[in-house]
Amino acid sequence: MDNRPIGFLDSGVGGLTVVRELKRQLPHESIVYIGDSARAPYGPRPAGQIREYTWQLVKFLLTKDVKMIVIACNTATAVVWEEIKESLDIPVLGVVLPGSSAAIKSSRSGQIGVIGTPMTISSNIYEQKIKRLAPQMNVLSLSCPRFAPIVESNEINSSVAKKIVYESMAPLVDRVDTLVLGCTHYPLLRPIIQNVMGLSVKLIDSGAETVRDVSVLLNYFEINRSREVKDKTEEYYTTASVLGFKEIAEQWLGEEVTVQHVDLDKELEND
């Protein structure tokens, strides 16, 4: 047993889609979440910058004595997950491999679509993982740089959001039977994306798939939280507006949350 929290990091609010799934599947686990909304989105940034920012978030989580880290960001997973995983002595999960595995199981035609940030798509990480596991699969990848900013600005129900999604998704319509939401922000746009693609297309939420792997690793390393301990904690931190983060978090999680602002440079200056 290990009653320490699980740490989650993301470029902003997108990783809350993973947290929501964790709260559904493993409601007894404690959580520390850090969203770097002040520097979101990560997708258009150069790899070196993404690496630097992600390591800052990791170091912040380590100050909270987490027992596991979930990189709840596809872009960060693509750039630096392997390095972080090899560097730490606690389990570190990314969101790409679980999403890839689920897509392979779902597809009947062998035609899989992947949407993500410019960095995730240009890295070809999903195509590489899928092809390694199932060489016969055909992967169609599409960069959707305007999606994450819509979510960060909480405009997911706006007419502008619908227009952008419809225009962006057009190249994949009627071409795939399975679509990987290759950015943890994208499940917040799921109803619009599903409407564009049609009900016959299976949408794969890479973050939700990752929580299944979290459960497996908790059992494997025997670091589940004791169900007899009642003082479960949830801490949410943002590098940007507390009010903006809180509004989106409460809408998505369906409950009141306390959010704290963090200045990473000051927090880690003595590191």
Swiss-Prot record:
This enzyme's EC code(s): 5.1.1.3
Gene: murI
MF term (GO), any: glutamate racemase activity
Protein name: Glutamate racemase
Catalytic residues of the enzyme: C73, C183
Methyltransferase found in the keyword field: no
Organism of this sequence: Streptococcus thermophilus (strain ATCC BAA-491 / LMD-9)
Positions annotated to bind substrate: D10, S11, Y42, G43, N74, T75, T184, H185
Pathways per UniProt: Cell wall biogenesis; peptidoglycan biosynthesis
GO biological process: cell wall organization; peptidoglycan biosynthetic process; regulation of cell shape
Cross-referenced Pfam families: Asp_Glu_race (PF01177)
InterPro entries: Asp/Glu/hydantoin_racemase (IPR015942), Asp/Glu_race (IPR001920), Asp/Glu_racemase_AS_1 (IPR018187), Asp/Glu_racemase_AS_2 (IPR033134), Glu_race (IPR004391)
Keyword hit for S-adenosyl-L-methionine: no
Superkingdom of origin: Bacteria
Record keywords, A-Z: Cell shape, Cell wall biogenesis/degradation, Isomerase, Peptidoglycan synthesis
Matches recorded under PANTHER family: GLUTAMATE RACEMASE
Family of this protein: Belongs to the aspartate/glutamate racemases family.
